[in-house]
A protein has these predicted regions:
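A short, N-terminal "cap"/entry segment at the start of jelly-roll beta-barrel domains
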Residues: 3, 7-122
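Conserved short histidine dyad/triad with adjacent acidic residue
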Residues: 105-116, 125-143, 163-164, 176
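Short acidic-glycine-tyrosine-enriched beta hairpin
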Residues: 124, 148-150, 161-176
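Hydrophobic/aromatic beta-strand elements that line small-molecule binding cavities or substrate pockets
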Residues: 130, 156, 171
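Short beta-strand segments in beta-sandwich/barrel cores
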Residues: 137-138, 147, 154-159
Length: 176
């Protein structure tokens, strides 16, 4: 169960996004959409879900290494998160099985869709935490949703088109 103090997360997240928009004016529009969406959320107080092996094996070290505002924000809510391994529909496909074994995500803000409940409800925005274990490769993909990723710890190797880039803690990545 979250305490009332944890509700500061939304205000802190909005302040963080506002600072990022000032730092990188090219991302003013998607960050503005995030800030606007965070302005109309409702606290949910869900029961924590079961843990997963990747979370048990890697979350502690990832949090210990997390730095900057993204790390602070994550540490403030992590105890209430419920984690899930995605892409059950791809079970039996070797590359997706390898991904799922070392990857989990947890909704923080989002819709109440009958699956795992986020900590705050919003029908306008989804924000969550992603935990990707060492040497896990997330396959190339294309989708309609624009995504903002903040690297809290570790190193993210990111591909956009044919170009690869490497991002460390504190980096904001816009995936569109």
């Amino acid at each position: 169960m979250r305490s009332h103090m944890d509700d500061r997360f939304i205000e802190d997240f909005k302040s963080f996004a506002q600072a990022e928009a000032l730092r990188d004016p090219d991302l003013e529009t998607p960050l503005g959409q995030l800030i606007e969406g965070l302005g109309s959320v409702d606290s949910v107080n869900p029961e924590p879900g079961p843990t997963l092996p990747v979370v048990r094996d890697h979350l502690g070290a990832a949090l210990d290494a997390a730095s900057g505002a993204a790390g602070s924000l994550l540490r403030g809510v992590v105890s209430g998160l419920s984690w899930v391994q995605p892409y059950l529909e791809h079970a039996g496909e070797p590359d997706m099985d390898a991904l799922r074994a070392g990857y989990a995500y947890a909704p923080i803000v989002g819709a109440l869709d009958g699956g795992l409940s986020p900590l705050w409800f919003s029908d306008a925005v989804f924000a969550g935490a992603v935990l990707q274990g060492p040497d896990v490769v997330y396959p190339s993909h294309v989708h309609k949703a624009a995504e903002l990723y903040w690297v809290a710890s570790g190193t993210a190797r990111w591909q956009k088109g044919d170009e690869w880039s490497i991002h460390g803690p504190g980096t904001l990545i816009f995936h569109d």
